[in-house]
Amino acid sequence: MFKFATAVILCLAASSTLAQHNPHWWGNRNTIVHLFEWKWSDIAAECENFLGPKGFAGVQVSPVNENIISAGRPWWERYQPISYKLITRSGNEQEFADMVRRCNDVGVRIYVDVLLNHMSGDFDGIAVGTAGSEAEPSKKSYPGVPYSAQDFHPSCEITDWNDRFQVQQCELVGLKDLDQSSEWVRSKLIEFLDHLIELGVAGFRVDAAKHMAADDLSYIYSTISDLNTEHGFPHNARPFIFQEVIDHGHETVSREEYNQLGAVTEFRFSEEIGNAFRGNNALKWLQSWGTGWGFLASGQALTFVDNHDNQRDMGAVLNYKSPKQYKMATAFHLAYPYGISRVMSSFAFDDHDTAPPQDEQERIISPEFDEEGACVNGWICEHRWRQIYAMVGFKNAVRDTELSNWWDNGDSQISFCRGNKGFLAVNNNLYDLSQELQTCLPAGVYCDVICGSLVDGSCTGKSVIVDDSGFGYIHIGSEDFDGVLALHVDARV
């Protein structure tokens, strides 16, 4: 009897963790956007006015719980919890709940960035949070939860990143490290996550997951509630979980410890796609992109060109400040059949600590748009760049098709088909791409969705004529604004 019961428990745990890889997208939608530091009311409006109509699948939102107030209001204060009250500069609980409902109503899921590893960093004296809660971080006292010193690991620094004990029990950049093996801590974290599930979220991005033991996270994930059916989720649906695990391939704490619990952020994807489109690697090598490069299995990998952390670091990672290469890399990301895709929506920054756009009272301001829909007041809004939202539509149009008919020039001009539904070509050389190429599309005239749109039966940008054999003449000049061309069946004239 005991062996049978144990087997049943193991089977249930396995099925539960597999379910945590399902993002619960509507229809053929399959791209998440990170609206970094946006207010809840603005996200609700964006879901209704832009994300839903453009076919985005979901939004990753900034941390929702009360955080410490830091001088100058740097973005990273959101990653220093004071309590689990749902009051931040993005809004209060009522505004958050309204946003979740309105986004779900138009088929856009909400994924919350959650902080289960730690509370705030050190602070002289009494710290005050965004909901007015007081805490004394130096004594590990957080009455708003409440947590006291016994709920944390003993203080120590991470000096050796190859020491598992230090990585998982010492303080990440001085942040007070919670003990997730404690029943009390587990109960408070589960209570917090369950409340968000009740409000209708579809899942969680788990910050600093590698700094928590996989066994502790497994317990927490398996104990939280099923998704709320009142928000359109099926019965017994589990929250989608994607975990921040930075693993460059030589880490003592590896991504493979977490990829069965949920998806994992594939940081090597970000680094290598940046290398390629910066010209440090020929694009021809991208034919084997994905697992052929040693990345995680497609359904386990949360993929991105940049995120809110690494876009601020020097190195190979691309960001909005290199727009041509960034748009090419994003087009490839969304066209190639690998990973669970997330695109970034940033605000402008001059240094690592730059605050989001705010007024004189340090209140986050709403994005404003020009006549073409681009943001103009400190918000970058890459997701509103035509070259990016058009590729979200491309990805929807080609969902569940295979890559075929790869072509390259032996260097950094490439093209490929997605079944008979889509075609992408990229030119990252310093000379023109002018070639008859197999598009795999039915005969007809197609709009290049990178440079224009299909409006009232005609293209606002350039078009490509595809013959009865599927071939079309493709031209991408070396000096062209975008360096990429994309055709799909939903943009046929």
Swiss-Prot record:
CDD domains: AmyAc_bac_euk_AmyA (cd11317). It holds the Pfam family Alpha-amylase_C. Ca(2+) binds at residues 117, 168, 177, 211. InterPro entries: A-amylase/branching_C (IPR006048), A-amylase_C (IPR031319), Alpha_amylase (IPR006046), Glyco_hydro_13_cat_dom (IPR006047), Glyco_hydro_b (IPR013780), Glycoside_hydrolase_SF (IPR017853). It is an enzyme of class 3 (hydrolase). One of its GO terms (cellular component) is extracellular region. Its cofactor is Ca(2+); chloride. One of its GO terms (biological process) is carbohydrate metabolic process. The keyword Cell cycle does not apply. The keyword Metal-binding applies. This is Alpha-amylase-related protein. Residues 1-19 form the signal peptide. The active site is at residues 207, 244. The gene is Amyrel. Chloride binds at residues 205, 307, 342.
